């Protein structure tokens, strides 16, 4: 499973709650291990709900992982994850 970090949230969706954090759903890592993995998180993603509203953005260690959606997306109504294509600059649904 990929390591990912939520970098921005849609405050209108969360009512201003702070949500940015590093997440690893199935396993716990030490702060040193997470710090070592942060440079690998270069793949930008966003998670959207069924109405096309982006609930949060982040970076992931893999470009084809559903981990952000699986771990926190459902709790926030997200049904879709998109990764930013580095060539076109556009987000594409996984």
Predicted feature residues:
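Polar/charged alpha-helical tracts
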Residues: 1, 31-40, 85-90
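Generic detector of solvent-exposed, compositionally biased contiguous segments
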Residues: 6, 22-26, 59-62
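Generic structural motif
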Residues: 18-21, 45-47, 81
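Acidic, low-complexity, intrinsically disordered interaction modules
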Residues: 51-90
